[in-house]
Amino acid sequence: VVSNPEATQRAGNVDEQPDRQTDSTREPGRRATAGDSLAEATPSEKRQLLRGQPDPTGRATGYLPGVDRLGIEPLRFVDGPLGVVDGESTAFPATVALGASWDPELARRFGRALGRETRANGHDIVLAPGANLIRVPTCGRNFEYPGEDPHHAARLTAATVSGIEGTGAGATLKHFVANNQERNRDKLNVVVGERALRELYLPAFRAGVDTGASVVMTAYNRVGGDYASEHRELLETVLRQRWGFDGVTISDWWGTHDTVAAATAGLDVEMPGVSPVARRVPTSRLAWLVERVGLSERLGLSVPLYWRVVDRLVAEDGQPE
């Protein structure tokens, strides 16, 4: 571990801080009541919460602007799986090394440290953990994943999510799903049977959802012909209906190909903004599309889910508990 002393001091001792779930002393901050403003938000203000924008500070990996008129603060997303990619932070060993430890408690402590450094650097959601399996030996991102066994990966993913979420930071499960090679990843079509999908590729994501992950990030690839960001069966039937996921789904960065198709399939947030490869929706036509192609109903679902995540995050000052 390459540990930064200043980061360690600012984030505090990982084991000395109370978990968010059991901390009854924290006063609710501004974000704790953000959902109350939903009824006052205009359709335009709601729409701006569902598409990323550049971070004014230039520090966040992803940024949702909030609504200043209603006192709704922005959400800041930061990479990554091996340590916060901003400011003074710790460079942790690769996730595959964590997998080799066979130690869920170590994974929880890792997640807790990652979450605390996320908060200490002024961010809300960390883009971790990676929950894909190691299936292709030449995959360039195998180091981000816990291993090749679905049960083992599920245990470590759940523990990491528990650690992150316990600090008040949000965890992001990625990349949903079957993103197991990097070559041609934005065009690749993964053909996988239902049994293999359930037994191999989904367990780690299911474990992370059951543990309370705030965000799920879709993969670049197609699954059975449909892009993961436009896959209604995965986003709605599996994630929402079967698993009961109540957080927010986001695309991988520039991972959408059709804004309307993604939104109607169940994707909540397009990151980091309008994709350069997507079929774009001009602002002048967006309101029309919202009403004409069923996006108003999707907007009514996505925005409350956004608030649910906002309300789970702590401390208006951006500091950990």
Features from the language model and the residues they span:
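Glycoside hydrolase catalytic-domain context in secreted enzymes
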Residues: 1-321
